[in-house]
Swiss-Prot record:
Designated name of the protein: Ribonuclease HII
Cellular component per GO, a single term: cytoplasm
Catalytic activity: Endonucleolytic cleavage to 5'-phosphomonoester
Entry note: cofactor: Manganese or magnesium. Binds 1 divalent metal ion per monomer in the absence of substrate. May bind a second metal ion after substrate binding.
GO MF entry, a single one: RNA-DNA hybrid ribonuclease activity
Assigned protein family: Belongs to the RNase HII family.
Organism lineage: Bacteria, Bacillati, Cyanobacteriota, Cyanophyceae, Synechococcales
Cited Gene3D superfamilies: Ribonuclease H-like superfamily/Ribonuclease H
InterPro entries: RNase_HII (IPR022898), RNase_HII/HIII (IPR001352), RNase_HII/HIII_dom (IPR024567), RNaseH-like_sf (IPR012337), RNaseH_sf (IPR036397)
Main location: cytoplasm
Disulfide bonds: none
RNase H type-2 domain span: 6-195
Key word Hydrolase present: yes
Amino acid sequence: MEDIKSLIAGVDEVGKGCLFGPVFAAAVILSKENEIELLNQGLKDSKKLSHRQRHNLVPLIKTNSIAWTIGQASAREIDVIGIRDATEKAMLRALEKFSSPPDLILVDGILPIRLWPGKQKTQVRGESHFASIAAASVLAKETRDELIKRLARKYNCYGLEKNKGYGTEIHRTNLIKEGATKLHRKSFISRLEIN
């Protein structure tokens, strides 16, 4: 059993720039052996992986990690507290699900998690530098995409099954025609002159 003090979690978010739905974050703790196994299975920056590759990596990440967690912040929370605070809230929710806090967290990007009481390191393009951040990126993206795919059945005029909530032309056009749902980020779409 590894010493709990040696545990390092990679953290990443997805969905910050979307017009629809929550922002998701994942945190993943990997051993050196886990890292090697996942890298050999094709783990890398989620943006460089196809949907099928990411989808196939999810069970491998879950079974080849010491621990993994998911957190989210709703569209309403984003509207009330802003995207940066909501993103941090999603990350904190993921991190707080670990049975013991990691000794160090590796955060993708330049901004630290302000309310995290422990040690942290930020890294621009972190998913290209740390396997744990790459794994967190894959879990967050696939988990959010699955939710949006389910919601697309109910809110079918916005093209969500393809755009995953991002502001594509069909999404923006139908927001103007049909109006926003309760899952749209009102603070993000106010410039589109939507009711």
